[in-house]
Design a protein with these regions (language model features):
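N-terminal export signals and maturation junctions of secreted/periplasmic proteins
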Residues: 1-20, 24, 39, 50-52, ...
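Short, functionally critical alpha-helical segments immediately adjacent to catalytic or ligand/cofactor-binding
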Residues: 21-51, 65, 90-92, 111-121
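Short loop/turn and capping residues at structural boundaries
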Residues: 41-43, 81, 128
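Short, surface-exposed glycine/acidic/tryptophan-bearing loops
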Residues: 42-72, 133-137
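Short, charged low-complexity linear motifs
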Residues: 50-51, 99-105, 143-150
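Alpha-helical segment that forms one wall of the substrate-binding/catalytic cleft
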Residues: 62, 67-126
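Catalytic and substrate-binding regions of cell-wall glycan-acting enzymes that process beta-1,4-linked
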Residues: 111-171
Length: 172
């Protein structure tokens, strides 16, 4: 049985009152978390910035692709700000993340797919492997991702608490 939110390939994005959204609950949640529906969003600058050094070095666009990941999925630097092109790249990334999760026997859930988007599939695998060990999240999370901790979870909390907070926050 196909889970409706998992059908990212056939989902659509659209603009409503200046905010980009999707007809797919998972895609819509990712857009909401990553950019608030603003295709010009740059990490640390939610309304966007015209500074080219910042624009070219940070996560950007609806799905907050970093330059290297965007390039892997066919996006030129400025195309990260194009909602349709960014969405096509996101669909490919989701496809690859589903394959990576399956390969590592990690359940295909909205939370796991989002965290694979945020942390990379390898980063999620590291967190997943530490969930039941009581490892503090600061030791399990990728070092460049420390800003992605949930504010309600102390920095020395176990990885499981961090994961559960994200699971509740994703809510798909």
């Amino acid at each position: 049985m196909q889970v409706k939110w998992l059908d990212v390939k056939n989902s659509k994005i659209y603009q409503e009152r200046g905010i980009w959204k999707s007809d797919n609950s998972f895609v819509n949640r990712v857009i909401q978390i990553e950019s608030g529906g603003n295709p010009l969003a740059v990490a640390g600058y939610p309304k966007g910035t015209s500074n080219m050094i910042i624009r070219n070095s940070r996560a950007a666009g609806l799905f907050q692709f970093i330059p290297s990941t965007g390039k892997m999925y066919g996006l030129k630097l400025e195309e990260r700000f194009n909602p349709e092109k960014s969405f096509e790249a996101f669909k490919l990334l989701v496809r690859d993340n589903i394959s990576a999760l399956a390969k590592h026997n990690i359940p295909i859930t909205a939370t796991n797919l989002y965290l694979a988007h945020q942390q990379g599939a390898g980063g999620l695998k590291a967190i997943w492997n530490n969930i039941n060990l009581g490892t503090p999240i600061g030791m399990a999370i990728r070092m460049n991702m420390n800003n992605n901790k949930r504010p309600e979870v102390p920095k020395d909390a176990p990885a499981k608490d961090w994961y559960n907070a994200w699971d509740k926050f994703i809510g798909v």
